[in-house]
Design a protein with these regions (language model features):
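Bacterial lipoprotein signal-peptidase II cleavage site
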Residues: 10-20
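Short, glycine-/small- and polar/acidic-enriched structural segments
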Residues: 27-183, 187-200, 219-220, 227
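C-terminal motif of bacterial Sec signal peptides marking the signal peptidase cleavage site
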Residues: 4-9
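Secondary-structure end/capping motifs
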Residues: 243-331
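Surface-exposed patches in mature extracellular/periplasmic domains of secreted proteins
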Residues: 81-82, 120-122, 179, 261-272, ...
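Pocket-lining segment of extracytoplasmic ligand-binding domains
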Residues: 140, 185-283
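Conserved C-terminal helix/tail region of periplasmic/extracytoplasmic solute-binding proteins
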Residues: 317-361
Length: 361
């Protein structure tokens, strides 16, 4: 597969002209296709640490698809997919144990940098809203985030950033409701405990509740204009600075992996399960639930993608609004200097209009 790039650079004059045009499209001063291929290969493995094992989630499924479909190989890139969990995967990249990872949101990237004095940079951005929401039992008087005051909210670890922002933007304070830590991941069992509200992922727990016939109301930050994001692949600034063309090609392959996964969800989930099953499925994933996860997330991505823009290009204005909301919520003691933590130029430079530029295609 990698030979396709070499052939494009070393074939007849017409083919060579095509390759030169492709190189020019990728940016003035780019190396030839052959040189770029050899440089990518010479780098060795690029380690990407996932945010939730091998789940079919945005930020993970396109990575798996790109590898399985040979897109990295076509660009002479050796990618090692390491199962991990957010936000600790960010620490591995900060420490230099991996080149890239995926965050649940841009806020998570910023928080990792602030807490760990890191140099993480968001290079793609799939979801332009929160993937989290609040579930309340059917018939509850809680109709908005301000209504959470004086209620009992079940928490798994911590309240997600997007929901902290939603509470703050409603005019309420997080301290106005009681929180109780929950064990396990069964939303049916959690609601049976008598809690008033449960933070969930829109691409996960609602499916389980629907399957069990449990009625509920979903408080979705999207319905309350809460600025948020999900599915945010990142790299270290040092990797981007030292290997700009390799970084471009990794992002290029990820975008093509997303296109494949969006067009063929069943095949994308099947690719994920090749890795899940090979690892012994320690998270007890089921194909039906992972298909629901990816169909839900890809629908949100498609529904909110701006017209006339290439998919995956980071929305810098939205990122700024997301961080401002969290400053107001008290998540950050002071406004962090977030602007260097996103690079939208890499992804935007890989498009001709809304068409991904791919060598030889």
């Amino acid at each position: 597969m990698a030979l396709s790039l070499v052939a494009a650079a070393c074939g007849d004059d017409a083919t060579a002209d095509d390759a030169a045009g492709e190189a020019a499209a990728e940016g003035e001063g780019s190396s030839t296709a052959e040189e770029r291929c050899e440089a990518n290969r010479a780098y060795g493995p690029v380690t990407f640490v996932t945010a939730f094992d091998f789940a079919a989630a945005a930020g993970i499924v396109e990575l798996i698809a790109a590898d399985a479909e040979g897109y990295f190989e076509e660009l002479c890139i050796d990618v090692e997919i390491q199962p991990g969990f957010a936000p600790s995967n960010g620490a591995l990249v900060i420490e230099g144990q991996a080149e890239m990872g995926m965050a649940g949101s841009f806020a998570e990237v910023v928080n990792n940098n602030v807490a760990g004095e890191g140099d993480l940079v968001a290079v793609l951005h799939w979801g332009r809203t929160a993937i989290e929401a609040i579930v309340v039992p059917e018939g509850s008087e809680i109709q908005n985030f301000a209504d959470l005051c004086d209620s009992l909210v079940g928490i798994k670890g911590d309240l997600p950033f997007s929901l902290q922002a939603a509470v703050a933007l409603s005019g309420a304070e997080r301290s106005c409701f009681e929180e109780t830590l929950l064990d396990g991941f069964d939303p049916v069992a959690h609601l049976d405990l008598g809690i008033d509200a449960l933070p969930v992922y829109k691409s996960n727990e609602p499916n389980a509740l629907d399957g069990a016939g449990v009625g509920y109301t979903l408080l979705d930050p999207l319905d309350f204009d809460v600025p948020a994001s999900f599915g945010v692949p990142f790299a270290s600034q040092s990797f981007l600075t030292e290997n700009p063309e390799l970084a471009e090609d990794v992002v290029r392959a990820l975008i093509r992996g997303y296109e494949f996964a969006a067009a063929d969800p069943d095949a994308a989930v099947a690719h994920a399960f090749d890795l899940i099953d090979a690892a012994g499925n320690p998270m007890f994933f089921a194909q039906e639930t992972e298909l629901f996860r990816w169909q839900t997330e890809s629908a949100l991505i498609a529904d909110l993608a701006p017209a006339g823009s290439g998919v995956g290009i980071p929305d810098v204005a939205l990122f700024g609004a997301e961080i401002d909301a969290l400053v107001d919520a008290g998540v950050f003691a002071e406004a962090p200097a977030w602007e260097p933590m996103v690079n939208a130029d890499i992804a935007s430079g890989l498009y001709d209009g809304t068409t991904l530029i791919w060598p030889g295609r």
